[in-house]
């Protein structure tokens, strides 16, 4: 039975789709077709500056790199929109440290 759950976990991670709600200023992933969702919240703190504030993944889904998909989507948004970013969220700080792409690094405000 545990093996079946493991297969299901792998299936979830291969079908993740990040949605961006610009009005609510959040990126989200619906998890396993349920009402559960992982979110990354941000705020505009200037005309071309965002603060990537918080990432949250429901406890039952942690450790499956779901937050990594949210962080990548958020940083890609910063690049595509030619924004600058404050990284208040510790997870996004970790993501950028582990993925030090020049297009990310040049947009981070310290």
UniProtKB/Swiss-Prot annotation:
It holds the Pfam family Acetyltransf_CG. Residues 19-109 form the N-acetyltransferase domain. It comes from the Eukaryota. Belongs to the NATD1 family. This is Protein NATD1. The lineage of its organism: Eukaryota, Metazoa, Chordata, Craniata, Vertebrata. The gene is natd1.
């Amino acid at each position: 039975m545990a093996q079946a759950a493991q297969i299901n976990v792998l299936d979830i991670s291969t079908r993740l789709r990040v949605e961006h709600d610009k009005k609510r200023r959040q990126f989200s992933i619906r998890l396993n077709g349920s009402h559960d969702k992982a979110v990354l919240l941000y705020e505009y703190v200037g005309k071309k500056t965002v603060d990537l504030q918080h990432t949250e993944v429901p406890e039952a889904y942690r450790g499956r790199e779901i937050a990594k998909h949210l962080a990548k989507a958020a940083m890609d948004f910063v690049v595509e929109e030619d924004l600058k970013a404050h990284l208040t969220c510790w997870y996004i700080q970790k993501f950028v440290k582990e993925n030090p792409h020049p297009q990310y690094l040049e947009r981070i405000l310290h």
